[in-house]
Amino acid sequence: MTGVQTCALPILEPYGGAINRYPMADSAFVHRNVDADLVVDVFWRNPAERAQMEAWLDGFMQLVRPFLNGHVYQNYPDARLADFASAYWGPAYPQLQRIKAAYDPGNFFHFQQSIRLP
């Protein structure tokens, strides 16, 4: 979907090869058993266009959801995720929380979807 002031850009990033050879249990990267990553960027300039583009994005994601595994690449944050911890880190999240507690007990590094202290 494109317009004078709006744009949607779906991108399919290929995975495989070295990414998939590394054991998934040995890192917090939950995307080791997939062939590709889907990224969808949407752009707008005002609140009305935002509503239009988010509606388009919701419809697009509903269309492709049957082909997705429920995980989201951590470097493409989605503020509307209901369970970002599971989507970004899957079963590695509790271990990441322990690491967070050991190295950042004061929660200096935090944002809306950062790893929470246990």
At which residue positions do the language-model features occur?
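Soluble FAD-dependent oxygen oxidases
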Residues: 1, 5-118
